[in-house]
Amino acid sequence: MATGTEPHLNSGGVRTGTRAAITAPHLRTDRWWLAPAVTAAGLLAFIVYSTWRAFANADYYAAPYVSPFYSPCLAENCETMRAGPNWDLFGSWWGISPAIIILIFPLGFRLTCYYYRKAYYRGFWMSPPACAVAEPHKKYSGETRFPLILQNIHRYFFYAALLVAGILTYDTVLAFRDENYEWGHMGLGTLVFLANIALIWAYTLSCHSCRHIVGGKLKHFSKHPVRYRMWQWIGKLNARHMQLAWASLVSVALADFYVYLVASGVFDDPRFF
């Protein structure tokens, strides 16, 4: 170091010879802890809610709406959904909630997402808790060891997320029916589903892996004008990846909650026509 001194080692933070020789864990005077605390609270709230709904195995279908947590329904014990996404692929041996089957894929996509990794690394593991704030861990291995090395399968979860988004789009189209499965109708739930699927697609396509797949390997953009234009569009979405991550997380929970309220008889779906 320029001062010829070594940093003072203590029990907090990863300390190496490249760090400033200060004894304080950080010099920030703002409320740096607020962002990771709010992030942790928001993620924890969603985890609690989604766990309850996934294992409830009830009140997830109110014609013509099916909860995004249960779509597609791949077990024999699914509620009958006329022309809906109830495809009996797992048979009768699957005895618990069918939501557990499908939620693996959207949750896997979000858990390995670059933004969510930053969010829960900071919010739950404090690794690091904030910029210019030393983390409390003595060692750092990054994502080179199990289980964090599994984060590298994010690109494959992206393809699964595309399939799930396609199925949810199908569910949204079915939402233009009434409770008697007649087409040409629209209710408040239809608007809820439209908002949700728009945010789901925006979040999915704003993914860093999507941006790389579209234009990351191109050496000459001039030779691929269509992919270059798509790469630019996705880049604009990518700049809002954090906002879209939270907005879509809230929207999918609200869509499920709306179906729950209608299916459990709290109120009837208001119909516009």
Model-inferred region functions:
Residues 2-273:
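Membrane-embedded alpha-helical bundles that constitute the cytochrome b-like, heme-associated redox core
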